[in-house]
Amino acid sequence: MIGKEQENNAELNQSSIIDVTEETPPEVVAAGYRTATGDSPTVLYRTSAPLMVDQMNTHSISIPNQTNRSQQIIDITRGLHVNETNDNGLNDYIPETAPFGDVGQNPSADGLKDVLVEHRELFIKSTSEEDPLLMEVRRGYVLVDSITIIRFSGDDLHSPLSIKFVDEEGVDLGGLRREFWSLLLHNISHSCYVTGKPGRQTFQSNYLEKKKKTFFHLGQLIALSIIQDGPGLPIFSDIVTDYIINGQTSVINPDDLPDGLKDALEKMQNSASDRDAKEAYSSIMDIATDIGFIVPITSFTKKHVKPLQAAFIESQISSCKDELNQFIEGLDTHQVMSLLRQPENRASARSLFSGRVKPITVGKFRKLLKFKYAEGNANQDQRATGIGFLTFLQATKGRATEINGIKLELKDVMMWLTGSTIIPAIGFHKLIDVDFADSTFVNTCALALTLKTQPDLSSEDAVSYYTELIINSQTFTKE
């Protein structure tokens, strides 16, 4: 009797499932309920629906992959639109997004220099100079080594930072520290921790590194960079910079998107008809689904393009929000983040994180140089040599400083002279002294350049001489 009753119950359950599938309108099934007596819906929670033993075994074996899951979502949303009279259409209401626009390139952080210097004096103990926070790193593994060191240096972050490169001579009087920060910036922007096109990057979601609090320690490093001769981390897109500085999005810039995706969306926006927009949408529907934009092809219109753009741009935050928040938490080491978020500091602080900082110009770089000409007979020879070097600086704006396909830029000259490709957030402690002698050499710690006196060198030869000298130096790296 018991066996017969179980068999009858099984048949009844199977009949109920068939009834829902065959008789209930598809839009009702997709919404998660079926019609009961009268007009009241009876909720059917899918997770508690009865499953036969064979069905359970099948589910345990056939776990759908990401593509299948995406297809199931697409099928469900498509089902909502099979009936054109359906009142639950997804495109009945299209929410507004943040305004689209362009904040423009960010100016330098010159306005923050004095504020940051004062802040450093409050938190970095000058009395600890004999026992600094020593980071001894391998030149080719700056990022890995520095994160390893800072994980175990939480109690030593108030000490002045001192850098030593393994197997290299040199005492850090400022130059090695600036060089370290430049190498760290380069390493981070080319690491597995970030994604996106250069100058428009965001963090890459990374479960293991998040659990290890790596992004928190990255934030700590950048906080130290900002107040100890570094440039910050100017690599992020506009929307990520907004989030770091303001905690929210103010303007959405399509230029934050990868070029291919940006072009596809522009083509969609400029479509002559909804039909053409649907066709363009079909080529990116899978990645749209991955970021949570669920609209079936049959329902897509040109009105959906702006929200779709916004969804892709905002995913630069939503896809890695935990990593970003962890980074921001680390940035508040020595209350640096709190300082930068003060209303009067926010505009200048953008340049410490935005990948759109205006590059230094030859004119501004020239103002960093202080030529020290001798009196008497040597004066004219030194001035002629100085003119040759200034001609070389001007030539970096064109193709004259290219050798064998390798292009030397002004930032490379700055790295050679100062150890930094970007002016530090707190600025340089002095101008770069330019002296003259029998050979050319630099002292990045002292911010001093000595030029070989060569009054008879032609302009063309001067450009070639300094170009070859810097390209063959230890500080030059070709991306």
Label each PLM-derived region with a short phrase.
Residues M1, E168, D172-L173, G219-I239, ...:
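Extended amphipathic alpha-helical scaffold segments
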Residues E7-A10, P26-E27, Q72, G170-L173, ...:
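Eukaryotic short linear interaction motifs
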Residues L122-D145, V240-E479:
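C-terminal catalytic/scaffold cores in eukaryotic proteins
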